[in-house]
Amino acid sequence: QPDPTVSQQAFMASSELTLAYIQTGDAQVDAVSKAGLTGLSQMLFARTSIEPATPAGLDLERDALVFYPLIYWPMTPNQPLPSQQAYRKLNAFMRSGGMILFDSRDGDIAGYGAASPNGRQLQKITYGLDIPVLEAIPPDHVLTRTFYLLQDFPGRYTAPEIWVEAAPQAAQKVDGMPFRNLNDGVSPVVIGGNDWAAAWAQDAQGNPMFQVGRTPQA
């Protein structure tokens, strides 16, 4: 028997813009993800004509991914690796135009990434994905012009590098435009460690739940 809650969640996401996050099994991390995407959804509503629905927490093994334009995936050291079926869903999601924002949440550590438990788990999880060639995000990428990430992509931390799909060699700058045509700037993955959900999270009064803008510590 299908889970009626899951069916209702998928139905709502198919009719309204819904941001989603991967449930890690860590209750605190999952709560921050939900609060962060709720805050981001509220910012979208306040600053644009978009009125997103309540963010959805996704179980990779059970839930459909196709209805969500953006999936936020925070790393924890002990979250399980996806099954082969889940990897197939993830790869199909990226091929169909969806974006996964991988967040190792370790931008407060100098030399973050593979040097941290979260970064090592990120490497293990992404090994089974069809991730394209990546590059450090260029200054003319479309994501540098979005209000919720801004030029230096601050989160709770301000780690130095964000990775996206590498631009094709043929990408050209159009006369009169301040940026190149990077395939509309669409990248199926964005990888960083700035703990974005914590930066977006707000309490009931609209105040930030966490200190933001910290730089890596040696």
Where are these predicted regions, by residue range?
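Extracytoplasmic/secreted proteins, especially bacterial periplasmic and envelope-associated proteins
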Residues: 32-39, 43, 85, 89, ...
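Aromatic-Pro/Gly-enriched surface loop or interdomain linker
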Residues: 1-70, 74-77, 196-197, 204-218
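An acidic, glycine-rich "communication" segment
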Residues: 108-217
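Surface-exposed patches in mature extracellular/periplasmic domains of secreted proteins
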Residues: 50-59, 102-106, 131-140
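Extracellular/periplasmic catalytic domains that process cell-envelope and extracellular macromolecules
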Residues: 10-15, 63-67, 86, 93-95, ...
